[in-house]
A protein has these predicted regions:
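Integrase module of LTR retroelements
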Residues: 1-222
Length: 222
């Protein structure tokens, strides 16, 4: 029987963590991505790491990125990766007051809708990463920006809008909103093109994921 998690009451109450591994090594020494998704708002952080980092270093990154920006979550949902089941990680979360919820290999549905969100993110990240190879980690901030400012059907708006009550205002999106702006600097033009590319990858990934989901659903209907 599917085990569903309770719906969070506040934006930063509950997060889901997972690793996207097996990526090409970058010049900065990264070969994996730590994906952290806020379950209520669907907003996400994509953090480049090396999978050989010790748990203590991963904990430092967690504190400097997540806790610094959003405070301590009440609940952390993850799979049973050894890093999430380690004594150090458990004691740290116990000290911070966060409850750990580990999904079972036999009941991955514990993650519910978030499991599908993570899968879509993995498809998007891998599509962008494989194209950029040795420099994919330099694209992660733009991938994160694009994801958090793209429409999500499950919440009916962009994650950024859920978090802050308004759509993100940025020169990168002015060309879509009809505002007149001169994109002068080469950096802005280049960044705009990168965002367009990432959005195309995201749409393609979502389309493939939907087709796969629809096919599985149709196969079950008989």
């Amino acid at each position: 029987m599917m085990q569903l998690l309770e719906v969070p009451e506040w934006k930063w109450d509950s997060i889901s963590m997972e690793f996207v591994m097996g990526l090409p090594n970058t010049l900065r020494g990264h070969d994996s991505i730590r994906v952290i998704v806020y379950r209520l708002t669907k907003s996400a952080h994509f953090i480049p790491i090396n999978i050989s980092f010790p748990v203590s270093k991963l904990a430092d990154i967690y504190t400097s990125v997540i806790v610094k920006l959003h405070g301590v979550p009440l609940c952390i949902v993850s799979d049973r990766d050894p890093r999430f089941t380690s004594y150090f990680w458990k004691r740290l979360q116990e000290a911070l007051g966060s409850k750990l919820r580990l999904s079972s290999a036999y009941h991955p549905q514990t993650n519910g809708q978030n499991e599908r969100t993570i899968q879509s993110l993995e498809d998007l990240l891998r599509a962008c990463v494989l194209e950029q190879r040795g420099s994919w980690d330099t694209y992660l901030p733009l991938i994160e920006f694009t994801y958090n400012n793209s429409y999500h059907s499950s919440i009916g708006m962009e994650p950024f809008e859920v978090l802050y009550g308004r759509r993100c205002r940025t020169p990168l999106c002015w060309h879509e909103s009809g505002e007149s702006v001169v994109l002068g600097p080469e950096l802005v033009r280049e960044t705009t093109e990168k965002v367009k590319l990432i959005r195309e990858k995201m749409k393609s990934s979502q389309s493939r994921h939907k087709s796969y989901h629809d096919k599985r659903w149709k196969d079950l209907e008989f």
